[in-house]
């Protein structure tokens, strides 16, 4: 036997494969027999090597594009590391905006000992939180420039530039401070706690 067009089914009956047919979509003669649809000899299934589509001889063609479906192995490969680098660069670019000028409101409460601290974006009594009343300030602000009303705390009005906040390793730690009354000048002093 030169051709392997003969196969057997479960009952060991010899069946001959049907001859190749012309593809009804691209009219190519490069087709091959795949199998019998529903194990009926009257419904042979073919696959076209040119357009990579299967069809049943004598059956109705479905409305499928001529280009057909590619195998997953033929799809273009996507380099996952380059995709993750692009996403990371886009996230970093979006996070590089300088704090949106502190659009959140800051609530203020001052104790009788005039000790005030910032925890997160809210002021609380420093002595109750940390038991500290005096510490070395890092940044000071004049009280007449602060607005303790219901308006938002604007970053650019208080000498806090975006360069002071970006890249600071202490920015994620709580900030403490106190009000100091020297020479009748009201100053609000802040420090970074380690």
Curated annotation (Swiss-Prot):
Keywords: DNA-binding, Metal-binding, Nucleus, Transcription, Transcription regulation, Zinc, Zinc-finger. GO terms for molecular function: DNA-binding transcription factor activity; sequence-specific DNA binding; zinc ion binding. The keyword Transcription regulation applies. It comes from the Eukaryota. Zn(2+) binds at residues 23, 26, 48, 51. Its main location: nucleus. A zinc finger (Dof-type) spans 21-75. One of its GO terms (biological process) is seed coat development. It is found in: Nucleus. The keyword ATP-binding does not apply. InterPro entries: Dof, Znf_Dof. Pfam families: Zn_ribbon_Dof. One of its GO terms (cellular component) is nucleus. Transcription factor that binds specifically to a 5'-AA[AG]G-3' consensus core sequence. This is Dof zinc finger protein DOF4.2. It comes from Arabidopsis thaliana. The gene is DOF4.2.
